């Protein structure tokens, strides 16, 4: 640090040098102009000057004034302003030096006491820890002794319990035997008593019959005399006849009651405590049962009411397709289009009569208007054609379908040529030039089908169309080169398709071959050898010398055996298009790999947008064949056009229906393509949400250096939450290639380039598939845009915000709206057509909508604080004086990724 001289200090405090030298001398510090000044000397000079010129003031007073304007309401709705001035005074007193020293000494003593207390606490804690350890040791010894005693007691109890259980079982067996003997004696006694009762009943009945025969004559004379007495007195006779009729009727009632009560008991619940009603109901039922014919009908007709139910609105069965216009929906329901538009407005959707609405919206509107809805799928014809097929029931093992992938010049073609030349049957017409993109080889352990596809284009395009044709991927890596960029791309494609990988380490016969280096490099990309605990087989081969080819084929068959590949051999065939082209003399030609069933010459096939009858079939040798089973590639002729690679091939029954399905698919192709383009847009990813599932943002990342790739990948993966996850489908160093674009199209991913650009072929794929391609040079911009896309996929948070409060002062009736509350707005603003709550004693008693809002008989949209208004609550009339009406609105708060 530079020393401060007297001259520089004088310049700093703006005083002459001679005067400053004199002041130093007066303070007892002799100095010259060029001498240095220390901080201690500055303090000494300052203290000298304070003593000489007087000390600093003991008090300091500060004053502050603030002015504001207050607006208060006046009469007539006007307001006036009042000026308010607030004055504040604050005095600061300098502390006495002796008092300061005393306070400092007290603070020092307090700190020392706290330190002493802390040291004592530490000592106490140590002693307590030692005592606690001793107690725990003693308790542990005691617990061990108790546990041993309990185990001994448990062993004794177990032995005694076994003896007790044996005694209990013996006692239970004896008890069951005694109970069975008692039950047998009781049954015999009941049978004897029943027999005696039946004999007594027969004896009484015989005596009654005999007495009736003996007294029959006496009873007849008495009845005759009684009839002559009745004729003498008409009134007595009439009353007696009436009583007899009533008695006879009562006997009928009593007789029928026992029969009808059981039948009506379950259907008619009986009320307790109302005996009169019960007996009356029983009497009515018994009389109805006793009368027959006309009486029963007359009773039913007399109880029938004359009121007839009014006719209901006609409920129709409405068939709705995937899309429908509002006008067509109205015609199907036989109502006016304005009624449908009104119903949609009630549901919160605005539409015109010619607007196309989706199936779900149309279903909601039709059901809201009381009609029954039947949903019709547009692809019913396609489903009917696909379901009308003969398929065999028994599945058999099939040959694996293998795709060979790898970097350029690593020996893919040489490996294929060697396998073809040694394993394919001799007599191939024209040699290699006759192959059709796929061939199969026969080995001692089984058959293998190889797809001879250039690069990864066909592999990825088939996966993009949903056709999983490949079972196993053979990754060819040169032992002298190791892992190269296209090797990494092949690994990413295989992982995205979830296909097992068998690694063929080629050029093993070269001197610079390093097998361990290849294993180490591949393990960094998730391809672990079996000897390292992974799942991938590493086979050293040489396509030039033929070393290890048989081991490679056996490894493929072993992997296929683990996968348990099976297919139905009989029935109509189905498969996938490997490649297709237009031949000048033969027309559209397609190479088909059969997956299930048997493809025969003359079958009618449906292939994507094309259809036709198989006029000819050729195998990979160029020979005519009549049929092809599972995992067999063939070349077929007879299609109406050239299909796309990866299209599904299906054999159907009817050529006419196949043509209709093909035309329907052509019409739907544009809609599907637009939907896929819209789905892959970064800004529209929030529209692809479904409640209750985890959303994914798929990214294909390319950067200029490996460090940038790793940094960006880590940053993107850290953005993942429980609701939205970032998935890196593929990443690498270098420009964006056609393979990257095809991978992004197959995975519905966005392409991100960091300091790199796309080549011409990649731009062509990006334009044709309308992929979302982003270029960045700043990593923070990349992270922010992906974070914004993820935030758009989060569902918004709904929040209720109270905007106004009104107090009910009076209630009056309106013929149009019912009860109208005369209110004074006490807080905020009351807005029309907003949801409200009615509060009574600070308790919510109703929640609904504000229907009418008036001020001085004029309809208004809002009423502000301090004004009176009339409020009509929709569908609610129980408004009382003193209630509070709370108006609120629901706002959506967009969530974001933190």
From Swiss-Prot:
Residues 506-509 are annotated as: G4. GO terms for molecular function: GTP binding; GTPase activity; guanosine tetraphosphate binding; translation initiation factor activity. Residues 85-159, 166-213, 221-234, 275-288 have a biased composition (Basic and acidic residues). One of its GO terms (cellular component) is cytosol. Residues 406-413 are annotated as: G1. Residues 452-455 are annotated as: G3. Residues 397-566 form the tr-type G domain. Its main location: cytoplasm. PANTHER family: TR-TYPE G DOMAIN-CONTAINING PROTEIN, TRANSLATION INITIATION FACTOR IF-2-RELATED. One of the essential components for the initiation of protein synthesis. Protects formylmethionyl-tRNA from spontaneous hydrolysis and promotes its binding to the 30S ribosomal subunits. Also involved in the hydrolysis of GTP during the formation of the 70S ribosomal complex. This is Translation initiation factor IF-2. The gene is infB.
